[in-house]
Amino acid sequence: MLFTPPLIPATLISRYKRFLFDAVLEDGTAITGSCPNTGSMRGLTTPGSRIWLSEHDSPTRKYRHMFEMVEADGTVVGINTGMPNRLAEEAILNGRIPELAGYSTIRREQKYGRNSRIDFLLSEPGRPDAYVEVKNVHFMREKGLAEFPDTATKRGAKHLEELGDAAEAGYRSVMLYLIQRDDCERMRICADLDPIYALAFQRAMARGVEAYAVKCAVSPTQISVSGTVKMDEWRPAVL
């Protein structure tokens, strides 16, 4: 996925109220913009960090600039939580995720479960439908190891339970973790920050849910899925 025009570099001053950030552009202009990530963004909001912004001229927007990427640990990291579904769809259609290849139809936001919508429903004659839920990942504490979640997520645990229900009903159920950085070779479930999600993940795997992780090549000019990442196993004492 290309950014046209390319993103604008800036220096982060602060990110606050979850939705807002202050920054200074390269010409010295101080700006306030919108942050398309309501999560903790743990480790990605250090004042003075180099960041990249998209620019929008729509008169209906309150803020002209949107926070898109940040340099952290020597690599560029995507922070826009609206991006993973777009990247996943592009990668699935282009066959870049082998585990999800071979489906001729892809539908977005289909109703399923208990008043929920699945990110993607993949269909192919002669094969069970595949329900695919996508999660955004950018948290890293140990070099080369991405982790999810970076804070407690009841909604995430609910998604795992509903995927398990679909798997037991005979459908293919897939949790796809999309990592918006390229400096990782492994991914694991972050049990210390959200033990409830970790238990829900293990239960889902036992019910037949599949889990895959992919990383992205990220730059101010483009972002795309670049390869698969091994998922570390984590087993709780009690299911």
From Swiss-Prot:
Pfam families associated with the record: SfsA, SfsA_N
InterPro entries: SfsA, SfsA_C, SfsA_N
CDD domains found in the cross-reference section: SfsA-like_bacterial (cd22359)
GO MF term set: DNA binding
Origin superkingdom: Bacteria
PANTHER family in UniProt: SUGAR FERMENTATION STIMULATION PROTEIN A
NCBIfam families for this protein: sfsA
Family: Belongs to the SfsA family.
Name of protein: Sugar fermentation stimulation protein homolog
UniProt organism field: Agrobacterium fabrum (strain C58 / ATCC 33970) (Agrobacterium tumefaciens (strain C58))
UniProt gene name: sfsA
